[in-house]
Amino acid sequence: RLLNPSEELDVHMGRAGFECSECHAGESHQILGASHGSLQQGTNHFGCVDCHTDEPHVKKILNKHTNSIACETCHIPTFAKEMATKTYWDWSTAGQDKKVENDEFGMPKYAKKKGDFVWEMNVIPEYSWHNGQADYYKIGDEINPENVVKLNNLKGNINDPNSKITPFKVMRGKQIYDSKNNYLAIPKLFGKGGYWKTYDWNAAAKLGMESVSLEY
């Protein structure tokens, strides 16, 4: 859909005829944008102010908001405008032989290999103070099974001068973990002994964790 998007879907591509690389430029595969690696280090970013400056509005009172509110907070009030996006994924229900039904958007609510899904359209983002950096869950990090595990932990707070209120898509789900060692398990999904052949979580987790040299 981004080959020829409407102005409502993408104002730069739909109205101005931009190509992806006009914003996501770079050299030697160092593409501008918030990848997992660059987001952790807070480098290689670009934003609206790189083209529009931090005083883009005719009304000066609106420009005062740019000190604490990211441009996207107002200018991207919803996402998944034309196609549904997955917002929940429950691996714990995988492996069942049950009837697969589509939701109101025509998307599958279940897949035997992957479990239950929830899809949404015209989603209102969730908002967080963010300074452009993040921490990530690393393989083998200990978890508390009683709490929600954040795989992407955004940095920033109201007292951080580099933080702004920023919109995010939050993906929630359930996945397997090692109840003895209290870390997330990495199952082998495909190939010999993989979960998609055996539908045996323990066997698949053992093989997967062996591949990253961790006990299961």
Regions found by a protein language model. Give the residues of each.
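Catalytic cores of secreted or luminal carbohydrate-active enzymes
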Residues: 78-153
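Residue-identity detector for glutamine
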Residues: 30, 40-41, 96, 133, ...
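Inter-heme linker and motif-flanking segments adjacent to c-type heme-binding CXXCH motifs
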Residues: 1-92
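Short, surface-exposed linear patches
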Residues: 42-44, 93-97, 103-104, 188-193
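Low-complexity, flexible helical/coil segments
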Residues: 55-59, 107-111, 203-207
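General N-terminal targeting signals
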Residues: 37, 97-98, 182-187
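Extended surface/linker regions that mediate inter-domain or inter-protein docking
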Residues: 1-17, 25, 132-216
